[in-house]
């Protein structure tokens, strides 16, 4: 899948926040806060991405603390609905939309609806919400939280149902490759050197095994350092030559290994490639090996897979 410059993905990431609740205008029409359930595209991407990162620590050259949090803030929304969102969700700091089961956040007792107001006893500095919806505030908070976790546990000051409490988030490392859900009616995915992203259409169409390979393939591009130059797409038209094709082979091999280590079946990779080949047949050959060759290589990699191997 194509490597996109980081700023391009970050400009689009805010949409994943609104997708988690439905469109903001729909969300505020409800009588009670709406949170994504476990089978929503948002939580599936977050959960599968967490498992891939957590279960492949030994295969990644660079690690960072994982939280298992799906977050939002007022800056994530259009200015026209921010007041309603603040009232409906009690949102003044950084809000918790979802928590990945079994994650550090889940073990800390964090819940959807919690509003994070402080770190280690110090209030979070507010980020001025801009004239348009933006992911900047969440990205800044996530980076700050990860940096603090690098030094050990972090005490979070949280408002829950109008009452303050303190929860302790422990450091739990995994691959330094974050995941994101982007809008899009076409099944597609990208990586930009930091994020592995899939479209809403892909997340809705793919089963867990297929989505595990799609995210694993994109995370592999991040882990292998492929963002230095553009390379071909798993689903779309690529622009590279022989070197790009080799990088796609590398990402397939590492991606299926990562997905197997996280508990997803190799058959999902085959189904995904078949499906995407039918949807994007005109562009795959520019940077990708043939689908049959890719599936054969994936089967070979899966046959040699050992959970303990690095």
Residue ranges and their predicted role:
Residues 32-61, 159-162, 238-287:
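Short helix/loop segments within enzyme catalytic domains
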Residues 201-202, 209-211, 218-234, 264:
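Catalytic Zn2+-binding segment of zinc metalloproteases
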Residues 82-100, 115-118, 174-207:
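Active-site scaffold of zinc-dependent metalloenzymes
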Residues 281-310:
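Pan-zinc metallopeptidase signature
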Residues 32-95, 168-170, 184:
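PDZ/PDZ-like peptide-tail recognition elements
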